[in-house]
């Protein structure tokens, strides 16, 4: 019996790994020109390059990060433009996940993140595969890549990963849930598109409220307090992930 269970688990794991590998292939086939060194023309990225030029020049001339920019909307903090954080751990995790050439890497994040969400909901691998395809190739998610809304694409792409961990917490799989959700939410916040993060936090709040409505009596209070506590822990861990010590830190 144990051998049978182990065999089934190994078979499912192999299938899931093959599906994830197929996501790499699908992403590269869809954006085939990147294989010949071509780059997609993104209007927002052209504007970003001009806006961030002052930051690049300051970095090259003074070997330090400027934290204020004069030529963007009459002045604004550079953390919303192109500041570099040398000790950003999640940035390194993001680069590992997005190992494909741009913009195929964004499509891969869409596919992988939504696949992990569906698997956390115990959806069959074949259904999860087609569900991921439907999500990743939805019209809007492709359009925003064309115009260069890269941070928005990344914030949307990592949201299902955070949601996968959140569902695990709701289903009392707290340890794995906290780890996955904190990393996913950290990556989502680290994408630096706070509008999408704001919408996503609203979604998580609604899911938490709706999930407690199905509980009764003492279970209602217990689940709400427990889930709320773990969710708060996730948020704190996510913020710790993206916090960046500098020489100006207290």
Give the predicted meaning of each segment.
Residues 198-237:
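Perimembrane helix-loop-helix junctions
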Residues 25, 178-193, 233-236:
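Membrane-interface alpha helices of multi-pass inner-membrane proteins
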Residues 155-171, 183, 203-210:
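Specific aromatic-rich, kink-prone transmembrane helix
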Residues 118-137, 172-178:
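Transmembrane-helix signature of polytopic, membrane-embedded enzymes
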Residues 240, 244-250:
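Single conserved hydrophobic/aromatic residue that forms the stacking wall/gate
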